[in-house]
Amino acid sequence: MKKVLVYVEGQTEETFVRDVLDPHLSLQGIYLKPILARTKRTRSGTVFKGGILSYKQVRRDVLRLLEDSSAVQVTTMMDYYGLPDDFPGKAEVPVGTPYQRVAFLEDAFRRDIDHPRFLPFLTLHEFEALLFAQPEQIVQAFSDPPKAASQLVEEVSRLSPEEINEGNDTHPAARILRYLPG
């Protein structure tokens, strides 16, 4: 079985890698191990996980993962939306399609890490946007859905993926937390 370490930015991505991708790829002899981004460690040793605060943190974590010689590949699953300002290439992103901008940043990331086993992956739209592919499924996920779930579905049903993914207060995770906190 070939081990691939997947550096993920949040719990949603971690769950997706563990519960969806890994079982599927294990049939082909590939074991995916999600590694959740660490945001800080206190003096007492408590580690806080989830979220990308700086590229310095990402770089340190990815280089540490590459020290695991039992992994055939190290990759990432991070949202293009909200990358930190110090991310490689972010200040020089060319005008072009969103796909071209993502490809440019992935290449800058790959060149900065500069390791043959590193394959960066940035998701163009926040991963949580997949939850809105069939918004009515959000309500069906609850045995006793709160009224807020229906309000969320009504709101996002009128929007395109680009509109759902726009801004600090309107990106998918923010919308979900606003209607369904906790």
Q: For the regions a protein language model found, what residue spans apply to each?
A:
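C-terminal accessory helical subdomains adjacent to catalytic cores in phosphodiester-
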Residues: M1, E14-G45, K56-G182
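Catalytic nucleophile-elbow at a beta strand-turn-alpha helix junction centered on a G-D-S/GDSL motif
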Residues: V6-T15
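Non-catalytic terminal and connector segments of soluble metabolic enzymes
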Residues: G50-G51, Y55
